[in-house]
Amino acid sequence: MFVTVGSTDSDSSKTAAKGTQKSSSSVKSGKSKKSRGLKIGGAIAGVLVIAAGSGVAVVVNNNRQIVVDAPPAVSHVSAPVTAAQSSLDDGTLAQKVSAIMDAAAADPAFGELHGIVSDATTGQKLWGINDTAVAMPASSMKILTASAALLDLGEDHRVSTRVSRITGTNDIVLHGGGDPTLSKDGEGFFQDSASIAELAKKISVVIPEGVGKVYLDNSLFTESFHETWERAGLEDGYIAPVESVMMDAGRIDPTNEESQRSATPAADAADALAKALGAENGGSLRDAAKDGQSLPLDPDPVALVQSAPLVTRVHEMMNYSDNVLAESIAREVAISRGLPPTFEGAARAVRDTLAEHGFPLDGAVLSDSSGLSTDNRISPQHLSEVLNSAAGPVESAEQGGLAEPQESSESTSLRPLLDSLPVAAVSGTLATRFVGQSGAGIVRAKTGTLNKASALAGYVVTKSGQVLTFALISNEASLLPARAAADKAASALADI
């Protein structure tokens, strides 16, 4: 079975024309494919609890046993914290990590390996190889995009899709606001998304006599398809033109993660709205305007709908490695910062945001924001720094003679990044990986795959209670062997 999506990894060797490989998901039949809302509930102090909004939880105890239960979903992501009775001092931990990773790095399956392992408690690098040198990251790039969005926009940020009325008429304009997660009828691919049906219902209340024509304003984004992307990605289901209003990120079949993507997603959304209203599709607003003159619009919108909060959309982006959603979220950051919502503007916004918060991307090349471009170059250290901030412990500060827990604003903002990472052998792009290995249910990481590039970056809780972050990027490697080598290395870290 070919189980892939996005620009990242799969257990298949299928590639597009330029070798972009799609990522694995949990299940491939209709809506049951989704593992929703996986969250870390409580500090990791010998016990890791991962609760799922779908009613499933994985509990990992000190004996590394995985127990499946069905507690309520946890609504907050707590930082991993090392066990107080950890048996390893800093020197012993570094020695063990170095021994494991030196042996792992000797595996030729890694190809040209760039890697780093750090202690999340201290941020100290425990092992590294080419860790400051840049490499092609594939979809591990999404860690940087997600981090920039959480830092700049905040986890509650939403995107609005609005409709205006052409003055003096019953004709309306659908204005794309940058949300690719809309569904047709509320039963789409993405969790808690707004729908065209909901929008139509609101419009009908304001214009009960009926709408004449529906026009599309798709002007927010001026670039939709990166010059390094392959058009074969539409048919293969891992990319679509990045337009300002889209249903299911362009999936023609929203029940199928791997569905072929539409070449005209914004026009599809406008057509769906026209049909829902029993109106005529008027086409592009730009084309409808005569002699370059704008059509007059009423100042107040007829209706609007809002996307799920950013924290939900980041989880979807990371869990399924959705490239369209990644590019759209990066453009939200660009708009927030007053930059053009283009590929270059979005990449600049990601870079500038991270630098302002203490995560400079020196030497990096950001060509797009999804990792799909083969021109991207980042280092394991770039990934490690944000992962360490997200996964680091709460610090203590003396206030009035008492130790009060506190954390940096960056750590607070980045906490949801932890929850967005797929769980080994459980969810998202790691659902079919680590099966039968000691890292199953223990490792949480973002994957990445392009031709001759494979990445795995995230964190692992060791047997001794340590929380380690890691970033492994292989270039010039065969995909499946490189992936297997990374899984083996991460599992070995879990056994420390």
Predicted ranges, named:
Residues 1-38, 64-73:
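Terminal targeting segments of Actinobacterial cell-envelope proteins
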Residues 43-55:
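Hydrophobic membrane-insertion alpha-helices, especially the h-region
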Residues 63-99, 285-286, 398-411, 429, ...:
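N-terminal low-complexity, Pro/Thr-rich disordered segments
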Residues 68-134, 199-210:
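Beta-lactamase-like hydrolase cores
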Residues 112, 170-197, 201-243, 250, ...:
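Mid-domain, small-residue-enriched loop/turn segments at the edges of structured enzyme/sensor domains
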Residues 123, 137-155, 245, 272-277, ...:
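Active-site SXXK
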Residues 250-415:
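A small/polar active-site loop signature that marks catalytic segments
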Residues 368, 374-496:
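C-terminal soluble interaction/assembly domains
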